Amino acid sequence: MSRIGKLPIAIPPKVEVTLDGRRVVVKGPKGTLDLTLPDSVEVVREDGRLLVTRRGESRRAREQHGLGRTLVANMVTGVTTGFTKPMQIAGVGYRVALTGRKLTINAGFSHPIEIELPAGIDIEVDPKASAIAGTRNQQGFNFVIKGFDKQAVGDLAAKIRDIRPPEPYKGKGIRYTAEKILLKAGKSGKK
């Protein structure tokens, strides 16, 4: 039995779960999420909890067991409390601003990059520049991506980070707040 897959998922009071064959729909205060599970996994409701079981003992079924349980648990967590991904942008002239549902990023290119926010995702931008830890004296901005779908929050965060990943000499670029960048020493020069 999968160590993760065998754990029950508690259903909070304000969450409504609908099971329809392989399809799971979770509705809560923050929104609605649905998921179609693989054939090898099924979800059963028992005593106000959800149990994820596998239909066979094949390697594929064992792999999908823990994954299916984690996906359903993330859906329940998402519609109740939501997910956040704090990020930072550091560098001279690097800025991030939110106008309506459009995020504008100035990251050292000749033009600003605009990203339309997907439905169910919000971004909170700290308007004050502050020193960014883990860089060599770089000022920057903090912003937080929020949403009830963990996958959508992570996808948007990765898309934003890919615009200008942190460089290894001064740490300039866009990074996750918890990310540690190993800074390299520059050239030593002539001796």
Curated annotation (Swiss-Prot):
GO process annotations (BP): cytoplasmic translation
Gene3D superfamilies in the record: Ribosomal protein L6, alpha-beta domain
GO cellular component: cytosolic large ribosomal subunit
SUPFAM superfamilies, sorted: Ribosomal protein L6
Keyword tags: Ribonucleoprotein, Ribosomal protein, RNA-binding, rRNA-binding
Superkingdom, natural source: Bacteria
Molecular function per GO: rRNA binding; structural constituent of ribosome
Pfam family, one: Ribosomal_L6
Physiological role: This protein binds to the 23S rRNA, and is important in its secondary structure. It is located near the subunit interface in the base of the L7/L12 stalk, and near the tRNA binding site of the peptidyltransferase center.
PANTHER family: 60S/50S RIBOSOMAL PROTEIN L6/L9, LARGE RIBOSOMAL SUBUNIT PROTEIN UL6M
Protein family (similarity comment): Belongs to the universal ribosomal protein uL6 family.
Record text on subunit structure and interactions: Part of the 50S ribosomal subunit.
The protein's name: Large ribosomal subunit protein uL6
